[in-house]
């Protein structure tokens, strides 16, 4: 696994006003919790966290969070982004404890997409990430979805995917066999249909 490090400082100035002041000073508020320890409020440099999460792999790797010199292993639980501009406004991290399962969202990588397209199909990506449950050592960088044998009308569900060893799909474990992608016939605009007649 690639190692990702993020520096942070503990903060005691809490609330909406404090968070707003942080953002105006090129920092963002964050919190780390779990691991049988109290939640801790943090301050992180906006440019540092933005650079880290430009790398897709950072979302599905154990990160080393350095809080005022004290290092701890964490995974990102959630990033709150500005609705219009997309920049990170807040981050939630969960501490990783060896031997304990964690849940994380892992990106989906679609391969062999050209195969159904050559057969005249169009692909709809229903899910771009999948929530998994596993120990930190088993956390995959991504889940691969192979579309080589997909035909028009194919719907690929979670149950069609092979989970890596030690990894469980959370939705499937709760009886929700979500669709991940489907292949359908091209949609024809009504004007085009009329012109063809």
From Swiss-Prot:
Disulfide linkages recorded for this protein, renumbered to the chain, are none
Could you state one GO cellular component term attached to this entry?
Answer: cytosolic large ribosomal subunit
What are the recorded Gene Ontology BP terms? Answer: translation
Q: Does the keyword rRNA-binding apply?
A: yes
Q: Does the keyword Transmembrane helix apply?
A: no
The family database entries (PANTHER family) matched by this protein are listed as: RIBOSOMAL PROTEIN L25/GLN-TRNA SYNTHETASE, ANTI-CODON-BINDING DOMAIN-CONTAINING PROTEIN (PTHR33284), RIBOSOMAL PROTEIN L25_GLN-TRNA SYNTHETASE, ANTI-CODON-BINDING DOMAIN-CONTAINING PROTEIN (PTHR33284:SF1)
Biological function: This is one of the proteins that binds to the 5S RNA in the ribosome where it forms part of the central protuberance.
Q: What is the protein name given in its UniProt record? A: Large ribosomal subunit protein bL25
- The gene for this chain is rplY
């Amino acid at each position: 696994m690639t190692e990702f490090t993020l520096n942070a400082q503990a903060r005691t100035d809490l609330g909406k006003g404090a968070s707003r002041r942080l953002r105006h000073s090129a920092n963002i508020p964050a919190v780390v919790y779990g691991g049988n320890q109290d939640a801790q409020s943090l301050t992180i440099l906006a440019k540092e966290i933005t650079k880290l999460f430009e790398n897709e792999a950072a979302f599905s790797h154990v990160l080393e969070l350095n809080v005022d010199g004290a290092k701890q292993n964490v995974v990102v639980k959630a990033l709150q982004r500005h609705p219009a501009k997309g920049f990170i406004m807040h981050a939630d991290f969960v501490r990783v404890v060896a031997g304990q399962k964690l849940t994380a969202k892992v990106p989906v990588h679609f391969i062999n997409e050209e195969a159904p397209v050559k057969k005249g199909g169009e692909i709809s990506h229903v899910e771009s990430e999948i929530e998994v449950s596993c120990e930190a050592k088993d956390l995959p960088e991504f889940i691969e979805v192979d579309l080589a044998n997909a035909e028009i009308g194919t719907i690929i569900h979670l149950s069609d995917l092979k989970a890596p060893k030690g990894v469980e799909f959370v939705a499937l474990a709760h009886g929700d066999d979500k669709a991940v992608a489907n292949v359908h016939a091209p949609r024809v605009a009504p004007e085009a249909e009329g012109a063809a007649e």
